[in-house]
Amino acid sequence: MSGSQNDDRRQFLLERLLDAVKQCQIRFGGRKEIASDSDSRVTCLCAQFEAVLQHGMKRSRGLALTAAAIKQAAGFTSKTETEPVFWVYVKEVLNKHELQRFYSLHHITSDAGRGRAWLRCALNEHSLERYLHMLLADRARLSTFYEDWSFVMDEERSSMLPTMAAGLNSILFAINIDNKDLNGQSKFAPTVSDLLKESTQNVTSLLKESTQGMSSLLREITASSAVSILIKPEQETDPLPVISKNVHVDTRCKRERRRRKKVTNIVSFDDDEEEQGTGDTLKKMPGTAESSEENSDRSSVNIMAAFEGTFGPNSNGSQSSSSWKIDSASLNGELGYQKLDVKSIDDDVDENEEDAYRSPLGRGHTGHAESPDRTLDGNACLAQVHGWAPLQVLHGDADADTDVLFPVSGVGSYGAADAPVGSLENGTGTENHIIPEPGLRYREASSPGQGSPLSSLLPSASVPESMTVHELRQAIVAMMNRKDELEEENGSLRNLLDGEMEHSAALRQEVDALRRKVTEQQERHATKVQALARENEVLKVQLKKYVGAVQMLKREGQTAEAVPSLWNVDAEVTVPEQKPGEVAEELASSYERKLIEVAEMHGELIEFNERLHRALVAKEALVSQMRQELIDLRGPVPGDLSQTSEDQSLSDFEISNRALINVWIPSVFLRGKAANAFHVYQVYIRIKDDEWNVYRRYTEFRALHHQLQSAFPQVRAYSFPPKKAIGNKDAKFVEERRKQLQSYLRSVMNKVIQMVPEFAANPKKETLVQLVPFFVDITPPGEPLNKSSRPKAVSRFPKLSRGHPREVRNVEPQSGDL
């Protein structure tokens, strides 16, 4: 494989594994439900981990030959494991006790099974992440077991394995690790033909049991799935197993009569018959089979394939013959499987049945007898009738009366597609379609001693001979797993499609945004081009004016050349130093040069003006920003500095005559209890190096506002926060009111500075307190005055006043408190 194909394969494995992990997390993540191997998502997850760990394993020919020799010497006839398995590398990182644990499993006999058991055990114990870190840590050891193009050798992708394993720790796994199904081939891509071929290896061991074991086995088959054992498929294609969804066990089967039992002969087939061809004969069990200890007589066990419904006998003991009918179809467009009934019948009924089913032929009992037809119940549905073939009766001994019925014809003798469509569309149809006669006949096979040809009983070498119930279950489970994998793959493809559609929608939105951006740029460029075109037109007009002036000068020079020359009074001819035409030409050329220079200077002035304009705009923005920062940091200044003045000279005058008076309201305190609680605002005033604090309520601010309104009508234009009766204790509201009161006090201070020039020239605390008593700093009794004179009075808020002499200058409030 090429490098691109290997990379595509690794990416495919990664996407499948990510999808399997995602499906398990969606289904079981964060829940208390246990994830067992009966769920297809868990099976798919294990299969994907196996595929990743199996990818790129190096083949060791010597080890494979050694293992094959050992198995051949031990007498195993199963196929030798030639494919390398990841267990050979996993066991390198396991300790002695862990190895002993997996080698001591009863049903695990192969390295592939141990690897799968280890994987499921790691998922159960949430130790897969730790094991994966150990497996991927040693790169040198990895290179000895894996190819360079394998998945685990890809550092970028293999590094995601522990992360995915860690994501599974939230799921409670309960997977069976000691399961003989783990010994088989890989379960992520099974085929029915492989499972059927492997099933022939266990036929002999399953059929070679005692009479009681056979009876119990038949009863177990009846109670679980009631599936007939295929002996000879007539077609070469892999037969599709058909298993009923519901099992109907007749209550008469449970009332087994224990008076006497008939000896049951079991026909067994060795594994060699697949290789020997059709010339060999069937092997049979000895006719002297063990009978029950408590019963001396013999009973027969008949395995009959039948559809769901009651098979009632007539009054004389024989079963009535009726036609097989198709009366209903399955729901939701899915054909159902018919139910089978395996019954153990007494010897008295068996004698009547033997008369009806058999006729003597020579030494053996071979012949044909038509089986009684059964009418299909109205609630049953027919699906793939070709899966149930005519049954064949095998006789093991001439003396034995035990008959076992097996299906003879292969799959496909009567297909579901052959049935009329009208009978399958609903369950209440009135049409009855009869199954062809050859599909309902039973044949009796003579014993091998009678020279019956093997070709009439055995299939070709390429088709499996028989299947046990467990193998049929395994085949169905494999097909269901494959179906789940295909559905999950379809879901992942749909998810990828949805992702691509979302990506495409995002790209469309991005393209639309780019188109809008390009359109805006084109509009801006068009506007700029129009402005340049207008400027060009203006320049053209100016140039025309300049050219007209130059032409006018030229015309004036030409008229000057027509003036006659001057003569002296003495009639002497005076030779002028220079002709007037030449003077006019020089004058015109000088004017032209001057005009050109003026035009150049005009262009330079325009460009210089544009530069000055841009610089002025930038400076104005910077000055406005710095002015706002100055107001925030240093407080108000004389004049309304917060408002941008168009008169630059006025602003310069205000800045040069600035009085150092600053006002802040840095904080608010809540005083009182319960319903009597109120807020107190801290007012901080600084005049040059003198600073003090005043604590006032909102009512005092409001009283000050009313006093100033009566004295100065201009104060009405100032923004004062209104009174609010409900919600005035909210922190956000109090903060907003603090900012508004601070702005109001600064406006009042600016007004005082403008109205009282003496105070602006020499600002002092005493002067401000006389002008505005609102700023009086009231000290509690007994407190000594500091350097600045303060009147002695009782403080209205003793807990907020200073309890010790204040320093000359306190720390200035931070900008964050403003």
UniProtKB/Swiss-Prot annotation:
Residues 445-462 have a biased composition (Low complexity). InterPro entries: PX_dom (IPR001683), PX_dom_sf (IPR036871), Run_dom (IPR004012), Run_dom_sf (IPR037213), RUN_SNX29 (IPR047329), SNX29_PX (IPR037916). CDD domains: PX_RUN, RUN_SNX29. Gene3D superfamilies: 1.20.58.900, Phox-like domain (3.30.1520.10). The modification Phosphothreonine is found at T644. Signal peptide: none annotated. The modification Phosphoserine is found at S268, S291, S292, S330, S344, S447, S452, S642, S645, S649. PROSITE patterns: PX (PS50195), RUN (PS50826). Residues 267-299, 343-375, 441-462, 781-818 are annotated as: Disordered. Disulfide bonds: none annotated. The keyword tRNA processing does not apply. Residues 36-180 form the RUN domain. Keywords: Coiled coil, Phosphoprotein. SUPFAM superfamilies: PX domain, RUN domain-like. One of its GO terms (molecular function) is phosphatidylinositol binding. Residues 659-782 form the PX domain. Residues 467-547 form a coiled coil. Belongs to the sorting nexin family. This is Sorting nexin-29. It comes from Mus musculus.
